[in-house]
Amino acid sequence: THSIHSQYFVPDWDLAYMLTEEREGYNPRPVDQAAVFHAYKDYAVGFSTYSEGVNDDVNKIIWSMLGWDPDTKPIEILREYAGYFIGQDLAEGFAQGLLALERNWRGPLISNAGVDTTLQMFREMEKKASPQAKLRWRFQMALYRAYYDAYVRSRLLYETSLEDQAMEKLRQARNSGVTLALSEAEALLDRSLTNPVAQDLRARLYELAEALYQSVRAQLSVDKYQAISVGRGANLDTTDVPLNNRLWLKQRFAEIRSLPTESERLAAVDEIVNWTNPGPGGFYDDLGNLARQPHLVRGPGYPSDPAHLKSSYVNLGSTGYGPRRLPGVIHSQAASFEQEEMYPISWWSTA
């Protein structure tokens, strides 16, 4: 049912997804759901299916079908699901599309080019779909996810590049002067607002959100569709949450400008530039960045430990969207690291 803050959360979910798609977004996870079922089926007699809403529609079907026949393959269930609810002409494509949506959430988003392929799959299905199929909420919701994932990835690539360019301006502060370096860096960071990327994807998201409200009364926004709160499935309201350190950097820039001397301002800029530099002989692990955890002891992971009782667990801290440095993550247990003869060690997290 829930992607984070739950018993069987999405493993290794990218922070960009956590910040935008949130806890109760549409989350077809057929492979993960089957892994949970098979990990614990020998400890139970019988089964029941639990659901909190339409967002986990695929998962409850997977669970129910496995309860009847544990040997059924997830793809077989998805084909039957798609044929019954969407149409036999789209059954194979839609079933494969649901698997692709699950793969969209595997590992670092910035390097997951499959997200764009998934969107193309659903766009092709949309072209072929009958008018009746296009009105079915299950079809609309999968489309919404495909567009949402692609929009988040487009923004992540863009905003990461803008921050990289801004940091290069800060590295030149000793030559250009702090005032100019801050102004140029800030202008680059603000391009995410003045020249936003992938607005066609964003516009389509809003169209699909309206379609879902009309077809099944999906409440994807607090103001537009009267959702209880942003964290309760209203991820239309978080589509544009910053995916880089723009808010934190701009706050720091304001503080630096207030410092009385150039030497103090330069020292503060150096602190930002060298934030992830632990010094000679050290290493820096970022426990909220899936691509920067080489020393983290991950444990068995899926499928043998789907509840992460013995595995590392990265999740989103519920501290709001204020100007703080990303990532803001929590760990459900003490993090363990491989021992190496190199000190000091630096790592970033919020406990």
Residues covered by each model-derived region:
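Active-site core of glycosidic bond-cleaving carbohydrate-active enzymes
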Residues: 1-55, 171-175, 187-193
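Generic low-complexity segments that are intrinsically disordered, proline-rich and/or Lys/Arg-biased
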Residues: 8, 12-18, 22-34, 109, ...
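Phenylalanine-focused residue identity feature
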Residues: 9, 37, 47-50, 85, ...
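Short secondary-structure boundary/capping segments
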Residues: 9-13, 62-67
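General secondary-structure edge motif
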Residues: 27, 61-62
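C-terminal non-catalytic alpha-helical accessory regions
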Residues: 51-59, 71-293
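Glycan-recognition and processing domains
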Residues: 266-350
